Each structure stands twice: as C-alpha cells, then as structure tokens.
From Swiss-Prot:
Protein name: NADH-ubiquinone oxidoreductase 20.8 kDa subunit
The keyword Iron is annotated on this UniProt entry: no
Cofactor note: Binds 1 iron-sulfur cluster.
Location of the motif Cx9C motif 1: 47-57
Cellular localization per UniProt: Mitochondrion inner membrane
C-alpha cells in the first residue's frame, strides 16, 4: 500500500517563538471549568464590550482570525481575570461553595441553586453585577429564580429564597447607590 513507514512522535511540541510586541502580554486565568461556570454570568456582565469586540473581530476574519484577534482576546482574558479576582476578594466563601457544588454535581446548575442565590446576592451587593440571562422574555421567570427544580436530586429547602436584585432604570449592571425608602 504505502511506500513509507509510518512514524509516530509521542513528544509534546512547544512553540517557543515569542509573540510580537504589538500583542499585549497577559497572564492566563488559571481557573478550571467549575469556577469559570460559576462566574460566567458576572464575567459576561462586566466584560460584554470586550466580548463583543472579540466576536466582531472573529466574524470579520473568518478562518484566519486567530492571529488578527489576539489583542481583543487578551482584553477579554484580562477582564475575566479581574472579575475572578474581585469575586475572590469579596465573596470567596460563597464562590467556593457554589463552584464546589458544581464540581460535585457534574456541572449541573440546577443542583446548586441555593448556593448560587447566595453568590448572586454577595456579588450584587459587593460588586454591583447581576446575573441576567440574555434575551430572557420579561414575562417569564428566569430559570435561576425558580424555587422548584424539576431534575434536582433533592428539593430546595423552604427557607431558601432566590435573590432578586432590585429593578432600576438605566444601567442594569450597577448596584443601586442608596436605597431610598419612599413607601
């Protein structure tokens, strides 16, 4: 059949060529899938503009956008890194409980709603970031605020209440300045 003998190289190859100086240097996130999933909506809330720029660059350079979009990708990484660092500073206990629950439950969000509600409350109060599902119809209860989960292994305790951030006009990703008691 073939005239040459197949040769398999089992060594890992590293490309040691440095990136050009025009590409900004950035440290990687250093987080596994569970912490990233736990913080994903908050990363999306704060880093939306960077994500949109990156996706626009990828769409404008189909099939060859890897090198052209490195700058935008580095901005996304830097922003996500800042969100993870801020959550670790402000809400470490709640964050750790939530991502550990995700890790223990095969990354199934519905198994960890009570821990998620506590994390959402802490992040909103300390960082002003809200968990919002994009394109959610206004007349439908978001899945993360439902008190009854169909596929959950155990029922949500009656004492657990979902955190619903106060509604406000304008920018939905900022914490309210001061709660005024008008009623």
């Amino acid at each position: 059949m073939a005239s040459r003998i197949p040769q398999f190289n089992q060594q890992v190859l590293y490309d040691t060529t440095p990136l050009p100086d025009s590409i900004p240097k950035v440290k990687e996130l250093g987080a596994s899938s569970a912490p990233l999933m736990s913080a994903a909506y908050f990363i999306g809330a704060r880093c939306r503009d960077y994500n949109d720029d990156f996706m626009q660059c990828k769409n404008e350079n189909p099939g060859k956008g890897e090198f052209e979009c490195l700058k935008e990708g580095r901005r996304v990484t830097r922003c996500a890194r800042s969100v993870i660092a801020d959550i670790n500073k402000s809400c470490l206990e709640e964050f750790r409980k939530h991502w550990t629950c995700l890790e223990d439950n095969n990354q199934q969000l519905w198994q960890c709603r009570p821990a998620e509600w506590k994390l959402n409350k802490c992040v909103f109060e300390n960082l002003g970031l809200k968990k919002e599902i994009p394109d959610q119809p206004p007349n439908v209860t978001p899945v993360h605020l439902r008190k009854q989960m169909i596929y959950a292994h155990w029922p949500i305790p009656r004492s657990a209440e979902p955190f619903v951030p106060p509604t406000q006009t304008g920018d939905n990703n900022k914490a309210p300045a001061a709660a005024s008691s008008s009623s």
